[in-house]
Amino acid sequence: MERALMDKLVEWKNSPRRKPLILNGARQVGKTWLLKEFGRRHFANVAYINLDQNTAMQEQFELGYDIQRLVSAFQFETGEVIKEQETLVILDEIQECPKALTSLKYFCEEAPGLAVAAAGSLLGITIHSGTGYPVGKVNALDLYPMSFREFLAATGNAGMSELVASNDPAMINSFAGKITPLLRQYYYVGGMPEAAAAFLERGLLEDARSIQNQILSDYERDVSKHLSRTEAEYAIAAWRSIPSHLGKENKKFVFGHIAQGARARNYQSGITWLEQAGLVTKVRRISKPGLPLCPYADDAAFKLFLLDVGLLGAMVRLDKSTVIGGSAIFEEFKGALTEQYVCQQLVSECGFTPYYWSAENSSGEIDFLAQGDNQVYAIEVKAEENLRSKSLRAFKQKHPWVSAVRFSMSGFREQDWMRNVPLYAIPSKALWGPEGEQ
């Protein structure tokens, strides 16, 4: 599978200001595979060290930060001869060894020619628990589940992958009949690499669902492993409640919907853990669409989305025929699945931090707001071809400086006040509005 982040890794390798790299991401999004494949393609050899339950290597880091001694230990561990500019050293599961994280500072200062890449699944939590982060001494990249474009490329549709990111609305509209079924397929399979690989191996959607169910179980075990029993119970309850929140017309996360009498203070630390582990995206409400958006965010009002649309379908046991073919009884949750997909693409494909807006004293709501370099995008999401946009129109009239965008299954069209962009063409930001055209 081709991952878009490979190009960023090559840029890192060739940068004259290269520092040790930290590749962040939730468990099972493909960090280990990507780093190994990167090393195979672009280095003479790879020295791979997994620090999870690796007592021998953890002891070496505990002894101090003598770089020559650590490199010797790496060679003994891997059997590889390590040379600057030729070898990629991979320190996997670095969150399991805090001293290894600290050592990156010394690799930066004393061995800048050695390419060291660390991968961490729960790194945000490790840092917040008191581990010294090597500020200013590392480069960092984030890896997410496969985007729709990456999924297209992986399924033998590389041409379509390029098309949906192109600035050619006429061509995109012409091939909607070919792209739309692939998008519905992505809704079911999602972007977890192992689930996608299982589907590709035999072409059976149920193979992907089996992997998704296993990943969901693994995630809950992770919660139980890293939190106290009480904290884990609260975190898992919040996690399991996400589909029911997204299935409501008002998708704002309400603690009282988790359990009768539930209080925010009991669940907040668990939600923070889920966010730092990369398992959820917290979409905060903003009070006004000013630049930048973040000062207007309200931490007390938010929506929670999962990291992957396929996992959301697995959590609610959506049948493949329902997702691929549609169903009258699927109409309400279809909106939740579509918003999950859009949120995921905004983060992984576009690099945005998504927010949302809702009126204080009325039912008006904008599904997502995103900040470009010099623009705010007000985004409405439609699961099919329903193009009524009452809330978006009112919001645009009140805030004429925003770019109004509607994502739907309908083809690209431009009106005097907004643009409709097909859901599968989200990567083509040039279609969104003025900023992309400059």
Please identify what each model-predicted range represents.
Residues K31:
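Conserved lysine of the Walker
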